[in-house]
Amino acid sequence: MKITDVRIRKVDGQTRLRAVVSITIDDAFAVHELRIIEGKEGLFVAMPSRESNDGTFRDLAHPINAETRALIEKVVLDKYNSVE
C-alpha cells in the first residue's frame, strides 16, 4: 500500500484540532476527514469518525494493523510539518 496524495487544510483556532486531512491510497481510494490533533504527547492522526446515538465516537475507516497506522501517521505528519 502506498499513500499517493496527502491534502492538508490547517485550522486556526483555540481547539486541539490542528488540521483536517484527505489521503489517497494507491491512486485509487480516497479517505477524507482525518484529523491532526494536539495531544498530551504531541500531534497524532485521528481517523474519520461519527458520533453514535449513545454519545461515543466510532471510526468510519481505520487501519487494521499497527504498521499501516504508523505509515499513515508518518506520511500525514511529515506533510503537515512541511506545509506553512
Cite the ranges covered by each PLM segment:
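Single-stranded nucleic acid-binding surfaces, predominantly the OB-fold ssDNA-binding core
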Residues: 1-84
